[in-house]
Curated annotation (Swiss-Prot):
Molecular function as annotated in GO: mRNA binding; structural constituent of ribosome
Disulfide bond residue pairs: none
Subunit note: Part of the 50S ribosomal subunit.
Record family assignment: Belongs to the universal ribosomal protein uL13 family.
Pfam families: Ribosomal_L13
Protein name, UniProt field: Large ribosomal subunit protein uL13
GO terms classed as biological process: negative regulation of translation; translation
TM helices/strands, residue ranges: none
Alphabetized UniProt keyword annotations: Ribonucleoprotein, Ribosomal protein
PROSITE patterns the UniProt entry points to: RIBOSOMAL_L13 (PS00783)
GO cellular component, one term: cytosolic large ribosomal subunit
Function: This protein is one of the early assembly proteins of the 50S ribosomal subunit, although it is not seen to bind rRNA by itself. It is important during the early stages of 50S assembly.
Length: 142
C-alpha cells in the first residue's frame, strides 16, 4: 500500500464564515490556522496547501483575557533608523481591527511561501458584511 500524497490541483477547498464576536483571540486563531493549513482533513499533506478559505466577521468584537486589552503591545519597524513603532491592543482594535486576527493567525502558520499562500486564504472584516456571497460560504461554529 502506498502513502497518499495530495496534489495541489486535486485539493477541494471550501469557504467558511466565522463570527468572532466574544471569541477569545488565541483560541479562535488556533482553530483558524489549523483549518487554513488543512490539518482537519484526512488528505492533509505538509508540503501542499490543502486548507480551506475562511471569512472572519466582527473582528472588532474579539475578546482577550486578563489585562491584555491594555497591556498587550504590537511592534513593527518602518525600515528606517529608529523606526520602531508600537501600539496596544486597544489602539489596534480602534485603528485596524482586522490586523489583530491576521497577525495572530499568521504567527501560527509556517514561515515561507507556503505559509504566505495559506494566509492569503484568510479574509477578515471588522463589520458584519463581506463581499464573498458568490462563493456561498458555510457557517463554521468555533
Amino acid at each position: 500500500m502506498k502513502t497518499f500524497t495530495a496534489k495541489p490541483e486535486t485539493v477541494k477547498r471550501d469557504w467558511y464564515v466565522v463570527d468572532a464576536t466574544g471569541k477569545t483571540l488565541g483560541r479562535l486563531a488556533t482553530e483558524l490556522a489549523r483549518r487554513l493549513r488543512g490539518k482537519h482533513k484526512a488528505e492533509y499533506t505538509p508540503h501542499v496547501d490543502t486548507g480551506d478559505y475562511i471569512i472572519v466577521l466582527n473582528a472588532d468584537k474579539v475578546a482577550v483575557t486578563g489585562n491584555k486589552r491594555t497591556d498587550k503591545v504590537y511592534y513593527h519597524h518602518t525600515g528606517h533608523i529608529g523606526g520602531i513603532k508600537q501600539a496596544t491592543f486597544e489602539e489596534m482594535i480602534a485603528r485596524r481591527p482586522e490586523r489583530v486576527i491576521e497577525i495572530a493567525v499568521k504567527g501560527m502558520l509556517p514561515k515561507g511561501p507556503l505559509g504566505r499562500a495559506m494566509s492569503r486564504k484568510l479574509k477578515v472584516y471588522a463589520g458584519n458584511e463581506h463581499n464573498h456571497a458568490a462563493q456561498q460560504p458555510q457557517v463554521l461554529d468555533i
